[in-house]
Swiss-Prot record:
Family in the record: Belongs to the ABC transporter superfamily. Macrolide exporter (TC 3.A.1.122) family.
Compartments, record wording: Cell inner membrane
Name of the protein in its database record: Pyoverdine export ATP-binding/permease protein PvdT
Organism the protein comes from: Pseudomonas entomophila (strain L48)
Domain ABC transporter intervals: 6-245
Keywords, in A-Z order: ATP-binding, Cell inner membrane, Cell membrane, Membrane, Nucleotide-binding, Translocase, Transmembrane, Transmembrane helix, Transport
Ligand binding (ATP): G43, A44, S45, G46, S47, G48, K49, S50
């Protein structure tokens, strides 16, 4: 006689206790099952036979007692080893079929092999062969709702045999079938028993139980009879699989599975679920899409604005310093920078050019047109200092400056507003204040220098003419200074500071700034603005993440039975965790990609509306990464909840 494959000794199972009444379902069950046996466990509803099957199939653990499988104490096995047993040793056939609704017949049959790490080609071939053997060759692509009850039960039998099905646990396999389909299922079980499979049949129907070699009766959680027949000979080749199980258990051969195959299956299953629930998926995606699109667009607008302002400021030169007298306060009088100071600064070796500036808003007239423009008195270094060339005509000369000539160089918008678009104003006159000035040149378009000031609405006249004819003051409003080396602006600033302190009897009655510092300050301001815009947009991404978590929690609740089915077919906790985490991440990835596409389209529209937009690859990748991380973070809790479900409770959930 062969050694028992399954040994139960004084198995007890109780529920409740402490805060609720204790209910003992199994009371001291002891039995042995040998390789090749066909055993029927018979009992009325509530007798404990299904609980016994769950313990035999490693779906549940007994409260007390000993369960040895192939010589190993099952109590010593961890959750992964129990999953291995369910995957490699057992095959379940349930009364309610327990097929995954979103999968085809073939996909349902292949499930145990996926968790076993079987290569796809081998897996597909075996599933098709099993379905063909069970008369379902033409139904491989059908989903459960497209199959009859008998066909669904045959699919579940094929699934039980996918990894070998050494031990078939059939719980009321004919209970939901008509007599013809029930007879077909029992004939299949008879055939499997004759091939050496251990068949454990759970039923309340004694006529069905009579097909077994051995009948065990359970009543009120106790075994009341056992009509054990003679044990099958262990010499039969079909029974050698039991020895193989013992050897693999002894070696600790716990199959890890092929992570690539499992990941592909997880992705495919996730896509199926998303496609089946398209409307709900779209609503969930909306939060992620809006979040990602908002982040990308906001950062692009901020970056575009920053680049535009920086370009405009840099266009005036980064080697320029500005000098002006300090404003008077209640504590001390104001300072004045004189033309003599300007001349002294021009002698410094660090200074390339120096230019006094006097100016203000004045009424300008030409014909019937009149408007206020900024009029600045400058010297001939204006184009060089501000990198601002004349595109038509000429700039005024040193002779004009020396004589105080009433000549003017105008900006592009002064030209269009006072003379009309496309006109030639050269040689014509503008009445500035009450003084006529002849237009001798037109400056290149420059745009806004900072804020809302438009540099093209500017008129440049000789400093001498402005100070005498227009403003009545010889002292400059401020002084523009160009350093020889833009990399040594700070050194130039220090030299000017020392010179002026000496000239002003040690007083620091002047302010000296440089464009490089202004550009850096503006860059910091723009960066802060971009971060603020991104943070505001990120809130919508957070809301989208909460939506993902909400929908995943709902999904876990809806698919609790599916989780139980996967566990019964050998899925480990990490497999379930991976499955639902993959769904959450895929949801976020699809939302992220869609959000980026929409953001690019919105950005294109903003560009057409002449709004500065600059998409930065790091910002796009960062937004996508945030979407994925959102899926991981907000999908982890629902996935962990799914992985921690009790297999028995999951299978019996509605």
């Amino acid at each position: 006689m062969s050694a028992p494959l399954i040994e139960l000794c004084d198995i007890r199972k109780a529920y409740g206790g402490i805060d609720s009444p204790k209910v003992e379902v199994l009371r001291g069950i002891s039995l042995s099952i040998h390789p090749g046996e066909f055993v029927a466990i018979v009992g009325a509803s509530g007798s404990g036979k299904s609980t016994l099957m769950n313990i035999l199939g490693c779906l549940d653990r007994p409260t007390s007692g000993s369960y040895r499988f192939a010589g190993r104490d099952v109590a010593e096995l961890d959750s992964d080893e129990l999953a291995w047993l369910r995957r490699e040793a057992f095959g379940f056939v349930f009364q309610g079929y327990h097929l995954i609704p979103s999968g085809s017949a073939q996909e349902n049959v292949e499930m145990p092999a996926i968790y076993a790490g079987t290569p796809p080609a081998e897996r597909h071939a075996r599933a098709l062969a099993l379905l063909d053997r069970l008369g379902l060759a033409s139904r491989t692509g059908n989903r459960p709702h497209q199959l009859s009850g008998g066909q669904q039960q045959r699919v579940s039998i094929a699934r039980a045999l996918m990894n070998g099905g050494h031990i078939i646990l059939a719980d009321e396999p004919t209970g939901a079938l008509d007599s013809h389909s029930g007879a077909e299922v029992m004939a299949l079980l008879d055939e499997l028993a004759s091939q050496g499979h251990v068949i454990i049949l759970i039923t309340h129907d004694r006529e069905v139980a009579a097909r077994a070699q051995r009948i065990i009766e359970i009543r009120d959680g106790q075994m009341v009879s056992d009509s054990a027949a003679s044990q099958p000979s262990p010499a039969q080749p079909e029974q050698l699989q039991a020895n193989d199980l013992r050897q693999r258990l002894d070696r600790g051969a716990i199959l890890k599975g092929a992570w690539k195959g499992e990941m592909i299956e997880a992705l495919q299953a996730a896509w199926r679920v998303m496609w089946i629930n398209r409307f709900r998926t779209a609503l969930t995606l909306l939060g992620i899409i809006i979040g990602v699109a908002s982040v990308v667009v906001m950062l692009a607008v901020g970056e575009g604005s920053k680049r535009q302002v920086m370009a405009q400021m840099a266009a005036f030169g980064s080697n320029i310093l500005y000098l002006n007298g300090k404003r008077a306060t209640a504590q001390e009088p104001g300072g004045i920078v004189t033309l003599d100071d300007v001349a002294a600064i021009g002698e410094l070796p660090q200074v390339l050019h120096v230019m006094p500036v006097i100016g203000g808003q004045l009424m300008v007239r030409q014909g019937n047109s009149s408007q206020k423009f900024y009029v600045g008195g400058n010297n001939t270094w204006f184009p060089a200092i501000f990198n601002w060339p004349v595109v038509e005509g000429t700039f005024f000369s040193e002779a004009d400056e020396a004589s105080g000539a009433a000549v003017a160089v105008i900006g592009q918008k002064v030209r269009s507003k006072m003379f009309g678009e496309g006109s030639n104003p050269l040689g014509q006159y503008l009445l500035i204040g009450n003084v006529p000035f002849q237009v001798v040149g037109i400056l290149a378009a420059k745009g806004a220098s900072s804020g809302s000031e438009d540099s093209d609405e500017r008129i440049v006249v000789p400093y001498s003419a402005a100070s005498i004819r227009l403003f009545g003051s010889h002292d400059p409003e401020y002084v523009a200074i160009a350093a020889i080396d833009s990399r040594r602006v700070n050194e130039t600033e220090a030299a000017i500071d020392r010179l002026l302190r000496q000239r002003h009897q040690g007083k620091h009655d002047f302010d000296l700034t440089n464009d490089a510092a202004l550009i850096q300050a503006e860059a910091r301001t723009q960066n802060s603005l971009s971060l603020m815009l991104g943070a505001i947009a990120a809130i919508s991404l957070l809301v989208g993440g909460i939506g993902v978590m909400n929908i995943m929690l709902m999904t876990v609740r809806e698919r609790t039975r599916e989780i139980g089915i996967r566990m019964a077919t050998g899925a480990r906790q990490r497999d379930i965790l991976r499955q639902f985490l993959t769904e959450a991440v895929m949801l976020s990835m699809v939302g992220g990609v869609t959000g980026i596409v929409i953001a690019l389209l919105v950005g294109g529209g903003l560009l057409l509306a002449d709004i500065a937009v600059a998409f930065a690859l790091p910002a796009i990748l960062g937004a996508f990464a945030c979407a994925v991380i959102t899926g991981v973070v907000f999908g982890f809790m629902p996935a962990r909840k799914a992985a921690r479900l009790d297999p028995v409770k999951a299978l019996t959930s509605e």
